[in-house]
């Protein structure tokens, strides 16, 4: 399935979603941002994309601490779906728990801690966009 120039951002914090979306659009206005407030919304969106045979996102950015379905469980469900295996996932979280990092390192997933400064944020957005560009097809 073809990938798009679209990033799926999954975070229950509306302010973080807005900030991340704006930062991505500032650097890459051609990148479409799709937002989901939890893992269930994200999985529903991905199932709809597959059902419609639409292009998959070039990247999924997941928060870890979310209601209904947390980031780890969402990630596990995404990676259990053969059609989604090739879509890279990056974790963008306020968690500083070493076990969270260890879990995702097993899967070669980049984990970004939500930054305290604009400079750190810009660096993270650049890394996220490079992940997306390497996958867009």
How does the language model describe each region?
Residues 3, 30, 55-58, 83-88:
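His-Asp phosphorelay/catalytic-motif detector in bacterial-type signaling
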Residues 73, 95-112, 119, 123:
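Alpha4 helix (beta4-alpha4-beta5 surface) of REC/receiver domains from two-component response regulators
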Residues 44, 72-85:
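Short amphipathic alpha-helix used as the core "switch/output" element in two-component signaling
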Residues 62-63:
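Active-site residues of response regulator receiver
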Residues 14-38:
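Two-component/phosphorelay signaling modules centered on CheY-like receiver
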Residues 35-48, 71:
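Helix N-cap/capping motif at the beta->alpha junctions
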């Amino acid at each position: 399935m073809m990938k798009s120039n679209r990033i799926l951002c999954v975070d229950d914090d509306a302010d973080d979603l807005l900030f991340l979306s704006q930062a991505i659009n500032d650097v890459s206005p051609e990148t479409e941002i799709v937002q989901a407030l939890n893992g269930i919304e994200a999985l529903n969106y991905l199932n709809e994309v597959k059902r419609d045979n639409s292009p998959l996102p070039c990247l999924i950015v997941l928060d870890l601490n979310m209601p209904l379905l947390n980031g780890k469980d969402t990630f596990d469900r995404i990676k259990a779906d053969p059609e989604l295996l090739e879509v890279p996932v990056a974790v963008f979280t306020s968690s500083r728990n070493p076990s969270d990092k260890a879990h995702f390192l097993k899967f070669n997933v980049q984990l970004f801690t939500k930054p305290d400064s604009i400079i750190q944020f810009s660096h993270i957005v650049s890394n996220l966009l490079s992940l997306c560009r390497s996958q867009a097809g």
